[in-house]
């Protein structure tokens, strides 16, 4: 598989996960979630600042919204001279939001989320509010509390409260999935996962994700994130070995998980598995990426006609996707093989 195509596919995941059609009926909003302010005196809990923001972002992705990724947010905050987790007054938050709207490139957010947390004698209180940047209007604070050991349930309840306040549609089945995934993962494994996904060093991130999988065997999101890191380095066999450890499809990356499996299978020269995984991804969410990967798999299996059909479906889904021309050239090479002198 060509390296350029693999890099294009992996880069596309930074924009957020693909979602079931039922979850994306309404136009998606774009959110910038700032690291939560740590109002507790225990600095060992600083990991929660970025961890809670990332986790809330995963929930919003699962609710069909767009979320600025951690790396882009870090660059934005550093450029604005704002330390991660620093408290922001409403006026400062609105000014930051205006900057994102004025940028020539990148995600232009229309919602800003401020958050804070406090831990006292084993109890945690978490609060967040949404600011509508275009209307310059702040919604009321939403807060939830509970035992620190039940952090994920508290965070899930906060996410659902924000969704209701924002009038985002969350199906009963989606809510049940949130409940199951938040109750199953031990707090220690969740902490390790948060430290991994909010880190900047890829080697350290991979080590932490492997550790999270040891602390909670089958941890779906840890397996997915580790697999994505390995795939970026084209370590296909290792990526396949870690992806198969996921005990279930990882929320909110269900479709992307199967797309990643398809990409890895192509890297391992296994078009049959790639075809199966791409079709699974498309059964969850129709996307240009899904049709392009399926087209790649069918091309590798020697079915040019079916690959061309998938190329047309990809164009219909998103004609601007940069991978379309890459696949078109590959199919043209098959039709008109270059002659060597």
Each language-model region and where it sits:
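Short coil turns that delineate tetratricopeptide repeat
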Residues: 217, 251-253, 285-286, 319
């Amino acid at each position: 598989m060509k390296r350029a195509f693999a890099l294009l596919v992996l880069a596309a995941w930074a924009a957020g996960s693909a979602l079931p059609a039922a979850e994306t009926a309404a136009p998606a909003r774009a959110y910038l979630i700032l690291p939560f302010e740590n109002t507790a005196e225990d600095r060992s809990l600083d990991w929660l600042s970025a961890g809670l923001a990332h986790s809330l972002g995963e929930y919003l992705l699962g609710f069909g919204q767009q979320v600025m990724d951690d790396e882009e947010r870090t660059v934005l905050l550093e450029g604005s001279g704002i330390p991660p987790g620093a408290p922001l007054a409403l006026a400062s938050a609105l000014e930051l939001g205006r900057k994102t709207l004025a940028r020539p490139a990148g995600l232009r957010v229309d919602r800003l989320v401020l958050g804070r947390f406090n831990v006292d004698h084993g109890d945690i209180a978490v609060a967040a509010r949404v600011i509508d940047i275009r209307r310059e209007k702040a919604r009321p604070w939403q807060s939830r509390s509970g035992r620190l050991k039940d952090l994920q349930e508290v965070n899930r309840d906060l996410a659902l409260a924000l969704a209701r306040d924002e009038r985002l549609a969350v199906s009963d089945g989606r809510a049940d999935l949130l409940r199951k995934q938040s109750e199953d993962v031990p707090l220690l494994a969740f902490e390790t996962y948060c430290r991994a996904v909010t880190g900047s060093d890829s080697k350290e991130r991979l080590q932490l994700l492997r550790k999270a999988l040891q602390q909670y065997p089958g941890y779906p999101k840890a397996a997915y994130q580790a697999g994505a890191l390995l795939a970026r380095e084209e370590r296909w066999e290792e990526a396949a070995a870690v992806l198969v450890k996921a005990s279930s499809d990882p929320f909110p990356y269900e479709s992307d998980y199967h797309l990643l499996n398809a990409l890895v299978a192509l890297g391992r020269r296994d078009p049959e598995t790639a075809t199966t995984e791409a079709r699974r991804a498309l059964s969850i969410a129709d996307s240009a990426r899904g049709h392009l990967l399926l087209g790649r798999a069918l091309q590798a299996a020697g079915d040019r006609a079916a690959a061309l059909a998938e190329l047309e479906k990809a164009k219909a889904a998103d004609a601007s996707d940069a991978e379309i021309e890459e696949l078109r050239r590959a199919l043209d090479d098959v039709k008109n093989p270059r002659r060597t002198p």
